Amino acid sequence: MPDDLFAVPRLARIYDAIEGERPDLDHYEAIVDEFGARSVLDVGCGTGVLALRLAARGIAVTGVDPAEASLDVARSKSGSERVTWVQADGSSLPDVRADLAVMTGNVSMVFVDDDEWAKVLRSVRGALRPDGVCVFEAREPARRAWEEWRRDLTYEVVDTIEGPVEYWVDVTDVALPFVEFVQHYVFADGAHLESWSRLRFRPRDEIERSLVDAGFELLDVRDAPDRPGREHVFVVRSLAESEIRELEVRRRDR
């Protein structure tokens, strides 16, 4: 089930305002250009910010998200008719044969179960064309980002279409590799809504192994330009079945 900040209509409507500027998306747009992708699958597209940016440039985009409330916000935006919107989770992606797939923000970290993560990776691979590229980010556990997720460091009042909203974050549990936290939203009418989340902080080597097991070739691991030293950006290529079989033979022969 998607977290309330995506699934509850009142929270989905203010999501973009709370998030503010998205410099992280500039990097994804540059990678789309780097690989010359003309079709993109946005997994966990949320309110469609990146999908709409790419579609405005003539790129064929499919935006997939499990939260209908977030997709409703995306569909209400100018240019939304250029994007194909699909309500689905990461393990049941449409077979669009995309040139490139992305998972921005914390999307890759919400799949906390190993089997679930493996299913998502296989689903992404199945949605890509042969040699298609997948790009996603994951936080570096050693940087302990959750230590900054507390009220005194995150509190702000944000102007939204719902009026001013008080916002802050509190961590509720740390049992690595899992971190749980709650985001608070206090509206001008006094309503206090909460969205509870759980993320898995996988180390880089564990992620790399999971990618190989799912049939990807690791092309690069980059520093996230908007959070240098704090996040890894993984760039991988979907292997053909013949390549996977060849790799399996090599492993057995070692």
What are these regions (language model features)?
Residues 93-100:
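A short acidic, Gly/Pro-enriched loop at the edge of an enzyme's catalytic core
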Residues 135-208:
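SAM-dependent methyltransferase
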Residues 102-104:
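A conserved beta-strand element that flanks and buttresses the S-adenosyl-L-methionine
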Residues 48-92:
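Class I SAM-dependent methyltransferase SAM/SAH-binding core
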Residues 1-36, 38-44:
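Conserved class I S-adenosyl-L-methionine
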Residues 202-254:
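C-terminal lobe and adjacent flexible extensions of AdoMet/dcAdoMet transferase-like proteins
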Residues 118-130:
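A short glycine-rich, Lys/Arg-flanked "PGG" loop and its adjoining helix->strand segment in the class I
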